[in-house]
C-alpha cells in the first residue's frame, strides 16, 4: 500500500513511518527542523509564558529528535520537506492508498502562543490533503475536543474544547467523511517525545529541588498506539474512536524505576478534580485490540530502558 504520513518526522508520525515501512511504501510530508515553532520554547506558567528552554531541556529535546530522525534513516521512506498546509505539487488524487494525518502543532499548551501555526498545521493542513487526495485518511485528532471532563466518556460525549488546540482539532474533524477514521488519543508517551519527556521533567525538578508534578490521567504508550494503528489498517472500519490504554499515570511507579530520589506532587486536572478517562471500548471491540503492555509500570520500564540506551549513545 502507498501511504502518505503528514507530520512523519514528529513523535507519533516517525514511529508510524518506521513500523509501517516494513510492509508498505511510505512517503513523509513534514518540514520539521529545529526552527519548528515552540521547539526552543517551553511553557512555565501564565506569568512566565514560553521562555527559551534550559540546557538540560535542550539536551533531552535534542536526543529525542535525533532518535526520530534515526528511525526515518533506517527506513526506506521518502521525505517531502514541506508543511501539509502549503501548496502541494505532487497532487495526483490517486497517488496514495491511505493518508495518516499526524501533522499539527505538537503541544496543546502552546496553541495560545503560536495560534496561526496551530490553525494552519491542524485545520488548513487537513483541508488541503482532503481537497487534493481521494483516498481515505486516518486523522489523528485529540481528546482535547472534549475539553475538561470527569469520569469515563465515550465518543458521543459533548465536544466542548477549552483552548485553541482543542477548537482546531474539532474544526479539522469536519473535513473527514464517511470513508475516514478519526482517532482521539490522550497523553501519548514514549521514546522520541521531545516536547516534554518524562525523564526531562524529573531531572529538571531534581535540579531545582522541587517536586515532580504527576497528574493521575489516562494515557497510551507509543508502542501500543502504533500496534493499534497497524490493526486498524488491516481491519478498516470507518468511524470516530477514542484511543487510550486506560493505564493511569502513577508517580510512585516513576519513583520506583528512576534511580534517583525525588518527591512527587499528585496534580489534579484542570477542573480541580481528577481528570477523566476515555472509554475506548468501541475501538477495542471493533478492531479486536490487545495491548502489548498490561500495566503502566511495564510501559515505564520499557521506556526508561530505551531512554538510557539512547542516552548512553550520545
Residue ranges and their predicted role:
Residues 101, 127-164, 181:
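Conserved Rossmann-fold NAD(P)-dependent oxidoreductase catalytic core, especially the SDR/UDP-sugar
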Residues 228-274, 279-280:
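Mid/C-terminal beta-alpha module of Rossmann-like enzyme folds, strongest
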Residues 188-192, 211-220, 241-249, 258, ...:
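Glycine-rich Rossmann NAD(P)(H)-binding loop
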Residues 113-128, 159, 163, 167-170, ...:
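Glycine-rich NAD(P)-binding loop of the Rossmann-fold in SDR/ketoreductase-type enzymes
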Residues 294-314:
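Amphipathic terminal alpha-helices
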Residues 76-121:
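NAD(P)H-binding glycine-rich loop region in Rossmannoid oxidoreductase-like domains
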Amino acid at each position: 500500500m502507498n501511504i502518505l504520513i503528514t507530520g512523519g518526522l514528529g513523535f507519533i508520525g516517525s514511529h508510524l513511518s518506521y513500523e509501517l515501512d516494513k510492509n508498505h511504501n511510505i512517503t513523509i510530508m513534514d518540514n520539521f527542523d529545529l526552527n519548528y515553532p515552540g521547539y526552543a520554547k517551553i511553557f512555565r506558567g501564565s506569568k512566565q509564558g514560553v521562555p527559551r528552554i534550559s540546557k538540560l531541556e535542550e539536551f533531552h529535546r535534542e536526543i529525542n529528535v535525533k532518535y526520530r530522525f534515526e528511525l526515518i534513516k533506517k527506513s526506506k521512506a521518502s521525505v517531502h520537506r514541506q508543511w501539509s498546509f502549503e501548496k502541494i505539487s505532487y497532487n495526483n488524487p490517486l497517488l496514495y492508498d491511505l493518508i495518516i494525518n499526524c501533522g499539527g502543532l505538537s503541544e496543546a499548551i502552546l496553541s495560545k502562543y503560536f495560534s496561526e501555526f496551530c490553525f494552519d498545521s491542524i485545520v488548513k493542513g487537513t483541508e488541503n490533503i482532503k481537497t487534493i487526495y481521494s483516498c481515505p485518511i486516518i486523522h489523528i485528532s485529540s481528546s482535547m475536543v472534549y475539553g475538561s471532563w470527569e469520569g469515563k466518556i465515550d465518543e458521543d460525549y459533548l465536544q466542548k474544547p477549552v483552548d485553541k488546540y482543542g477548537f482546531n482539532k474539532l474544526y479539522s474533524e469536519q473535513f473527514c467523511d464517511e470513508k475516514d477514521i478519526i482517532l482521539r488519543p490522550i497523553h501519548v508517551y514514549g521514546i522520541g517525545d521531545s516536547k516534554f519527556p518524562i525523564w526531562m521533567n524529573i531531572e529538571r525538578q531534581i535540579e531545582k529541588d522541587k517536586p515532580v508534578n504527576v497528574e493521575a490521567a489516562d494515557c497510551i504508550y507509543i508502542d501500543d498506539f502504533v500496534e493499534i494503528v497497524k490493526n486498524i489498517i488491516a481491519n478498516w472500519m470507518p468511524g470516530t474512536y477514542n484511543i487510550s490504554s486506560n493505564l493511569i499515570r502513577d508517580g510512585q511507579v516513576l519513583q520506583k524505576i528512576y534511580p534517583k530520589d525525588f518527591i512527587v506532587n499528585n496534580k489534579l486536572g484542570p477542573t480541580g478534580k481528577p481528570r477523566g478517562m476515555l472509554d475506548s471500548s468501541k475501538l477495542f471491540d471493533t478492531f479486536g485490540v490487545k495491548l502489548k503492555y498490561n500495566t503502566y509500570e511495564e510501559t515505564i520500564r520499557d521506556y526508561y530502558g530505551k531512554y538510557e540506551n539512547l542516552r548512553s549513545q550520545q
